[in-house]
């Protein structure tokens, strides 16, 4: 780690259509090889599909999906006297959002629909209704933390 300066955090610019920084961060995570216009097309296309299917504000559905996927606790490896323990720790708000975004996109990419727009919209709708692979990932993470509760006194 550098002893001199802490890296400056760059401010995320809100997305042009809905004015949401969370949506902009999501778009940046969908983006591959710096192709932001492609990522925008995918995300906005998925939100349009969500709007027609859910009959609700697509940003509200998106926020609900993120909240349903965001983990409250996770396990981190801690080495104590030659043994490695999985220690449950609470997740900071920013990391909760980052993990939720990462899991949503990974789950959408793993789906079987034909286009990424269809996959992403289906995963967002599933997550908003507490279903889908991303929600399952959150449940697995919580289950791991619960199973390792005995080691919570090793927290740092």
From Swiss-Prot:
Coiled coil: none annotated. Part of the 30S ribosomal subunit. Contacts proteins S9 and S11. CDD domains: uS7_Bacteria (cd14869). GO terms for molecular function: rRNA binding; structural constituent of ribosome; tRNA binding. Keywords: Ribonucleoprotein, Ribosomal protein, RNA-binding, rRNA-binding, tRNA-binding. InterPro entries: Ribosomal_uS7, Ribosomal_uS7_bac/org-type, Ribosomal_uS7_CS, Ribosomal_uS7_dom, Ribosomal_uS7_dom_sf. It comes from the Bacteria. The gene is rpsG. This is Small ribosomal subunit protein uS7. GO terms for cellular component: small ribosomal subunit. Belongs to the universal ribosomal protein uS7 family. One of its GO terms (biological process) is translation. One of the primary rRNA binding proteins, it binds directly to 16S rRNA where it nucleates assembly of the head domain of the 30S subunit. Is located at the subunit interface close to the decoding center, probably blocks exit of the E-site tRNA. It comes from Xanthobacter autotrophicus (strain ATCC BAA-1158 / Py2).
């Amino acid at each position: 780690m550098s002893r001199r300066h802490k890296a400056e955090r760059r401010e995320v610019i809100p997305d042009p259509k809905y004015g949401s920084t969370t949506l902009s961060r999501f778009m940046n995570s969908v983006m591959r090889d710096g192709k932001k216009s492609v990522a925008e097309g995918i995300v906005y296309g998925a939100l349009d599909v969500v709007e027609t299917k859910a009959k609700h504000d697509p940003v509200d559905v998106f926020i609900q999906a993120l909240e349903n996927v965001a983990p409250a606790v996770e396990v981190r490896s801690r080495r104590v006297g030659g043994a490695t323990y999985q220690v449950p720790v609470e997740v900071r708000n920013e990391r909760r959002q980052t993990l939720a975004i990462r899991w949503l996109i990974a789950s959408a990419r793993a789906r079987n629909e034909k286009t990424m727009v269809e996959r992403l919209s289906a995963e967002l709708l599933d997550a908003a209704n507490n279903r889908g692979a991303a929600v399952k990932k959150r449940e697995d993470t919580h289950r791991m933390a619960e199973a390792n509760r005995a080691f919570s006194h090793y927290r740092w």
